[in-house]
Amino acid sequence: MTTANAYKTESDIEAAVVGLYSDMNPYPGDSWLYYGGYMIMITDYATDMGYSTAAGDPTKLSNMTYDASNRYFSNNWRDMYNVISNANTILDNVESIDMSVEKKNLVKGQAKFLRAMAYRDLTDAWGPVPFITSLVKNPFTLNDVPLTPVSEIESVLISDLKECINILPASWSGQDLARATKGAAATLLGKIYLRNHDYTNAKTYIDMVLNSGEYELESDFKYVWSENNKYGKEMIFALLHETGQNAAEIACHFGPSDHPDVPGRWQYYGVSLPFWRSYDKEDPRREFFYYDYTGDSKRDDKSNYGFHYMIPEEGVVDVPNDTTKYMQNVATMKYTYDMISDAYYDGRTICVFRLSDVILCKAEIENNLNGPAAALPYLNQIRGRAGAPEYGKNSRFPVPATKEAMNDAILKERGYELVFEFQRRADLIRFGKYEEIVNAHLKKLGIAQPTNVTSDLRYFPYPLNDAQLNPNLANENPSRLPK
């Protein structure tokens, strides 16, 4: 079977579209690739947000000592291009299928949206990349494919996403609930404009989402993450899974270690203690972590109780007794809240875009176009929903007086609200704070020189295996490595 004869009927092309969604969380024996977990390492982990206790590649990313051989680079690169390749195959074949124009448009809209997602992720991480928009029949031609500037890639993505907005539905239902929509396409388009600080165009598409009437904040921020609310009214685009279909193992990797209520999880991806400590103590989201509990496993053969796991006060190293263990990082509850199944393949929903993110994008846009007063209601909308002290309503949180101060407040809020939702690194870079905040974080941890992160590290090195095949990638890598 080849691409020339595999797509003959409407059911063939529809099966390919379903497969394209599964490519966002591929399952080659482990269901934790790309948005299933690996994506977190090149978004939130290589910042002040993540801290690894695992040896090797995870630690090298969280302490900024990575090199081009890091598996999180090669695997994410491969999986992003797999989405692109399969989307290109669909788009190259759909016109020859005997089906209505309306159905063809739905196929094209979904394929172009998911391809745009993959290219947005690639350009966030690596900047200029090989830009391929049709099926590659001879893979050897890729060995010297040139790097396309980000601006040229974006011009195509912008055109594609505008088309997606026109041809995708406002919503789907039933088993199709998690497919791409107008709102998802508008969100991605708004974010691409925002990445370039094009606030006027970003406002057009962010407002389109906010004014659509399709989305609504949950009254309780925790309920966003409940398994009883798998694709709730706040979700704009998410990857929906079912336990019985060997789908997603995100709870295993993000869940707490040795916890009695969430057994069998690994805490492989943990939030750094300095980041967790930076939450205001009156912010209920601070409590949405597993930071103080008695372990499920007995301490030893003579005890009926587990260790007491807790976070030490800053600067404290020595544990008070032999029944206590200090945690080196802390697990979020987002991917284990209201667990329905203890199965290894947990079936958890993986959020990609949700309304609170878009509202904070609106705050950012209004601040940069019209100043702090215009941004304040949107910032406080998210803090108010969470139950955190609001700016201008609490003496400890005066209204930021300048655009710069308001941007700082919005950036902090994005971190607290969107922790471990694949946002932090792009946010820090967009706000011009990446070097400053990550260097301060590394200095606090004592694991690197305070100048370890420079502007050269805006982009990651191209994966070693690919760079060995393509000199255009190899030539760029020396400047992209931590010194």
Q: What is each model feature region?
A:
Residues N5, V17, N25-P28, A46-D79, ...:
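Elongated scaffold/linker segments in the mid-to-C-terminal portions of large proteins
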Residues E14, S22-P28, T53-W126, T148-E152, ...:
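Conserved, well-structured interaction surfaces
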Residues M1-G36:
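A short, exposed helix-loop element centered on a Lys and neighboring polar residues
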